[in-house]
Amino acid sequence: GALNDWWGNGVGSTPYAVKHYKEAVRLNRICDRLEEKTGVHNEELIQAYGDNSLLYAEHTWGHSATVTNPYDTMVTNLDMRKNSYASKAHEAAAMRKNEQCHKLGDILRYYNLSGKVKAVSTSHQKRVFPVEFYVETLSLSAVKVTDDKTKQEMEVQLSAHPRGVLISFLAEFEPMEEKTFTYEEQP
């Protein structure tokens, strides 16, 4: 089939790039809240995110040549450049989030079948949130997760993850609360 008319269809014609961009926006908002806890403010990454997210959101979708000549090099270059703005915004936001999480004690990689994980609420309201992390392993058939403070055993769900096993559960958090959970492989 023919290529989409990016000019005419706009945001709906590029769902993957838009999803990537919206994830960058979400990560940036999380980082704004995490900064309240860490006091760390990386102006360079904030500026990189801001510049690129603005360029992505403002830049038009395509060129009038997409209607008559969609395979033209200029059309392809404009499309690639526009998508790169979303990607660079996402990269800056992800780097900023990794920096914030590291300051809060996260190791960012989990290879052990038993250990501890910290979850941080970025909400100013008491709420129940999903907590998810993955363990890089070939198999993990069962796991026990316990809230270190209350000793409550959490109801967990295990699912496949591209790099191992994803562990998911729900936990109630006070505003901006940090919680530590212990996870242990079960036979």
Question: Predicted regions: what is each one?
Answer:
Residues 173-184:
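Short Pro-Gly-centered flexible turn/kink motifs
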Residues 111-116, 127:
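Short, solvent-exposed loop/turn segments enriched in Ser/Thr/Gly
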Residues 122-126, 182-187:
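Beta-strand-rich N-terminal accessory domains
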Residues 141-167:
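Solvent-exposed beta-strand/loop surfaces of large extracellular or lumenal domains
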Residues 120-141:
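Surface-exposed beta-strand/loop patches in extracellular or lumenal glycoproteins
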Residues 1-107, 116, 148-152, 179:
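Catalytic-domain carbohydrate-binding cleft regions of carbohydrate-active enzymes
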